[in-house]
Amino acid sequence: MWKKLGRKISTTVKDDPEKHSQIYVPNPVIVPGGRFREFYYWDSYWTIEGLLLSGMNQTVKGMLENFLMMVKDYGMVPNGGRIYYTRRSQPPYLIPMFKLYMDHHFDQDFLRDNIELLEKEFLFWHNERQVKVQDRKGMTHHVAQYRVNVSDPRPESYREDYALAQDLATEEEKQQLYVELKSGAESGWDYSTRWFVNNETNNGTMKDTNVTSIVPVDLNSLLCVNAQTLSYFYNRLGMHDKKREYDRIAEEKNITMSKIFWDQTDGVWYDYDLNAKSRRRYFYMSNLHPIWSGCYGPEGSRARTMEKLIKYLNNKGVLKYDGGMPTSLEDSGQQWDFPNAWAPLQHLAIMGLYEARNIHHAAEELSFELAEKWIRTNWKGYQELHAMFEKYNVTVVGKAGGGGEYEVQPGFGWSNGVAMRLLELFGDRLTPTEGNSAASPTLSLALGLLMGLLSLGVRSQFF
């Protein structure tokens, strides 16, 4: 598995950069798979989960060094490993990646040598992607959004973007659409009705993409936990003034989760519409990100918050599907919508519920139920097609997802990493099919998928 996805960038890229679109990095990388032949930023968090479980600490350290080098060169981590990606990023999971590595192999010198670069990446999002929002009481909150102020088509999808914009009336409208499409790519959710704004609804087409008018709940939840993690890192280094600084930033962001994103009536967090000055009350799996980050907001009981959230999920009917939780309930033909399910979103929801097991009695069992559904759909797809896919269809167990701008891709880095993490956590309880009573069903499912994933010898430290 990892051998198939491993790449080493040729030194010719370093020696003659004008002849190549790749970004040179010194250490080996893991690519997602399929058509994606370069590394990508946020994918790597879940890939690293799997690499660490495979004992590949040195490979992970090398990947982190690559990302840190890019922060030094570009001020942030680019979307992916191509020169044309350097003007946009992706969801900032570098600090959580670093924390995963530190949790497996704490390296004080590595942390000390790179803490300034970790902070530099945080400040890119904290400053360069910041907007101000007022809550109902007139208090100002600093929030972040995906916003790429580059007004030409995406280089990797130039033809599609150019064609989409052709019937717009003015050059300014075309340029703004290009900004929105690039901002959607920066979000990682390219594309979804989540970013459609049409008369203050999410009904529309790709031309209604308006990412820069939306404040994403998951991005701000992620920056909250990033601030908490920086505080932890500074404390480990004995840098107590910096620890207190990031304690304050984290607390401000935690308050914002309550004041801007939390909907007390529905019992969930939502994206915020800057123009309408209101929350966008639609189901997207991004709404659940705060249960993974732990940034629930300081108000009220966490147990009560979890109770309301589980009720919300039941009321929305998103727990009824055998193939996992859908990305949204909007059947738009976009890949980050119904009926698709994505490994990173399943992981965030499952792990968030699992971490809440001591907060609410139902959270751990729901976490297990979702994990079991996800592993079953991975296993069935692997049995039938001998591949792991980037996305799956929640309505048919084992079926690959579809929609969007390209065919579903096999590989697949983050799907592999999530499966390995869930097998590690729940492997002793999983069953291959609902109601299965065969001997040792947990062993057959867990070992079957794990052996498939490990069939190319992931335990070998190949780099």
Residue locations for each model-derived region?
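Extended glycan-interaction surfaces of carbohydrate-active proteins
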Residues: 1-38, 62-68, 74-77, 81, ...
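Alpha-helical support elements that line or immediately flank enzyme active sites
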Residues: 40-70, 286-298, 347-359
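Inter-helical turn/loop segments and adjacent helix faces that build the functional surface
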Residues: 101-113, 230-245, 356-362
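C-terminal GPI-anchoring signal of eukaryotic secretory precursors
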Residues: 428-448
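Short amphipathic alpha-helical coiled-coil/interface segments
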Residues: 118-122, 243-258, 367-375
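Aromatic/His-enriched, Gly/Pro-containing loop or helix-boundary segments
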Residues: 71-114
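TPR repeat positional signature
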Residues: 44, 95-98, 220, 224-227, ...
